[in-house]
Each structure stands twice: as C-alpha cells, then as structure tokens.
Design a protein with these regions (language model features):
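A contiguous, low-structure linker/loop signature
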Residues: 68-110, 133-134
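Short, glycine/charge-rich beta-strand/loop segments that flank catalytic centers
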Residues: 65-75, 139-146
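Active-site loop segments of alpha/beta catalytic cores
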Residues: 1-29, 35-38, 50, 61, ...
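Segments that shape or occlude catalytic/ligand-binding pockets
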Residues: 37-69
Length: 256
C-alpha cells in the first residue's frame, strides 16, 4: 500500500498494512527550505515546498495544510503580525471588531480579494499536482467562530457571547457565508479532504449548548459544502473536554 491507499483504507474501517501516521509537520518545515516563518506563510511556492519536504524527508502518510490560524481573517482586513520564528497572529491592538457595537461591520466578503486565502488555494493546487493518489492532501480551514475570534479577540468574544449573543451569531453567519464559497473553491483544487477547526466545541471554552447555538448550524452548513462536492470532511479540535458527539452530529466527519 502507498500512503493514499493506507489512509483511505483506514477511513473506510478496513485494515491497512500498518497504522497511518501523521505528526503535525507544518511551520517547522520552513527550516528545510531556509525560509523565515513569515516567508513560508506568505509565499505559495515556499509554503508548498515545505509541505513537500515533509513527505520526502519523513515519509508521513498525508499532508494537512495548517499554515496558521490567521489565513481567513485576512479577508476582512485584519492587521497581522508576522514574527520571524513563530506563526502569524492578529494585531489585537487593532481588531477589526473593536467594540461590541461593531459586529455589524462583519459582512460577507469575496474571499478572492484575500491574498492569504488565495495563497492557500495556490498551495493546495501545487500539492495536489505533486501528491494526488500518492499522499492525501487535506486542506485546513478555521471555523467561522474561530475566524470571528481573530477579528475581535477571544476574551472579548467570550464576554460578548453573554452580553449580545445575537450580534455574535449574526457575524458568525456572515463569516460562514464567505467560508462556504472559499471551501467550494478549495474542493475544486482536487484535495482529498477538508479539515475544519472547530476549536470552540470544547468544555474548556464554552458549554455544548452554547456551541450548538453559536456555531453548530454554521458548521453543519459549511461541512455540507464539502459533502456536496464529494470531498471528505475531517475535524480538528485541540481543546479540552471536546464535544465529539456534537461535532459528529453537525459535520458527519470521516475522522477527528
């Protein structure tokens, strides 16, 4: 079996020749290309080269394009900081949503105007060209509530969920409408799966009921885009006390 066959067998609950292995080898691979973190995360050719080196040098069984969590928020003009040796992150002193009254600023936008989202799509095209049928290519997408937290700041967002949950949910909807079109374009690159990061679906952040009310329906609609395109859905969640049941109900993933 090659890596693609091995992973597909496991996802279909069949016995592969061995357990598929995927350690997270993303930003660290910039060192194999001689690039800074900033260059690796902003230049499609360099970024793709890093991911390709991960399969060449370590023979991992798939590639997940976790670049950083600030890809999608770029579409709304969030100012970012690109450190030399760590992942990009928002400049929280200049949040797009600076106050609870400003959630109305968040409207559906054209993802094609985002340099970072289009860079990610370029990376995916390069990886699919090189790896299709040999290694599964899995696109990483931050969920709508996570993207909104990049535009507001997590602590402020948490408080806003209590003070004006309707405003937050309305903004989540607008973000999600943008992400739907973005995910459709991602699926059209030929990727094998889309991995959604629904970080907030964990007990260390909020209750299960709050997650369902705030992001659950949006996550369902977003996953449906990939399902309709015939692309597998996966879920990433690095929180604590994760709500596996709620995420499975919403997104029907093949893997978590």
């Amino acid at each position: 079996m090659n890596s693609y066959e091995r992973v597909m067998a496991a996802l279909q609950h069949k016995e592969p020749d061995r357990v598929p292995v995927y350690p997270i080898l993303c930003g660290v691979m910039r060192k194999r290309t001689g690039a800074s973190y900033a260059q690796w995360s902003q230049d499609a050719q360099t970024c793709a080269e890093g991911f390709l080196r991960s399969v060449q040098d370590f023979d991992i069984d798939c590639v997940v394009t976790l670049i950083d969590l600030s890809i999608e928020c770029d579409a709304w003009g969030q100012k970012l900081i690109f450190p030399e040796n760590e992942a990009a992150h928002p400049d929280y002193s200049q949040c797009v949503v600076g106050d609870i009254e400003e959630y109305g600023k968040i409207k559906k936008v054209d993802f094609r105007t985002s340099q970072r989202m289009m860079m990610h799509i370029d990376v995916l095209k390069r990886l699919v060209k090189e790896l299709k049928g040999k290694k599964p290519v899995v696109a990483f997408v931050f969920g709508p509530l996570g993207v909104l937290s990049m535009l507001r700041g997590q602590q402020n967002l948490y408080m806003d969920l209590y003070d004006d949950p309707d405003a937050v949910r309305a903004a989540v909807h607008e973000v999600n409408e943008t992400l739907k079109e973005y995910v459709a374009a991602i699926c059209d690159t030929g990727v094998d799966a889309v991995m959604f990061d629904t970080l907030f679906a964990s007990g260390s952040i909020m209750s299960k009921a709050m997650w369902k009310e705030t992001e659950g329906q949006a996550a369902k609609e977003l996953a449906a885009v990939a399902h309709e395109k015939g692309v597998a859905v996966m879920v990433h969640n690095c929180g604590q006390r994760i709500y596996f049941d709620a995420q499975i109900e919403a997104m029907n993933p093949v893997a978590i």
